[in-house]
Amino acid sequence: MRIGILGGTFDPIHYGHIRPAIEVKHALALDKILLMPNHIPPHKHQPNLTTAQRLKMVADVCSQLDGFELCDIEAKRDTPSYTVVTLEQLKSLHPEHELFFIMGMDSFLQLKSWYEWQRLFDFAHLVVCQRPGWQLDAAHPMQQILTARSHAHQETHEGHAKNTHKNSGQIFPVTITPQDISSTQIREQLAKGEIPADLLMPITLDYIQNQRLYLP
């Protein structure tokens, strides 16, 4: 089974998370996508909502989307949500499956600042979402890693038959439709009494309004 993993604060979860995940699922023929809320994001400030509230919103979204499931493995943890620890744990639970960890190009460019980043490739492939026509500068230090671990590059240089069994360690660049949406933008709109109906799934907006979340 080919399993995509998209982590995030999801404070709140919105179409800027959901639409790229759907596009990646189709592009790479993934069997399912795990949406994984962080508990204590190491690279971010503490979230505005409780972990339980964010889990509820993500679970609601998953109930509306085919092939999407909530993964609460990080939410249950009392330590920072380091990706390598999570992927190692998921791989031990599903050793026979291929894991595809989804990230944006901005995160990929900061990958060397991540805790034990080299070990990510021991447990999963990386999916790097990029805007149409975007090209990483050839001199950028991450370009060598992107080239060496690119799925297309390895297919060409190692041969398709040899490479098909490889279930971690590759990078899959995927061009996605740009989504000019941020959780900060949504929280600001809600705090002003505006209704960002075009940015959130209806089930998410209903929960936020019913619980009176993000109000000043």
Curated annotation (Swiss-Prot):
GO terms for molecular function: ATP binding; nicotinate-nucleotide adenylyltransferase activity. InterPro entries: Cyt_trans-like, NadD/NMNAT, Rossmann-like_a/b/a_fold. GO terms for biological process: NAD biosynthetic process. Pathway: Cofactor biosynthesis; NAD(+) biosynthesis; deamido-NAD(+) from nicotinate D-ribonucleotide: step 1/1. The keyword ATP-binding applies. The keyword Cell division does not apply. It comes from the Bacteria. Pfam families: CTP_transf_like. The gene is nadD. Belongs to the NadD family. It is an enzyme of class 2 (transferase). This is Probable nicotinate-nucleotide adenylyltransferase.
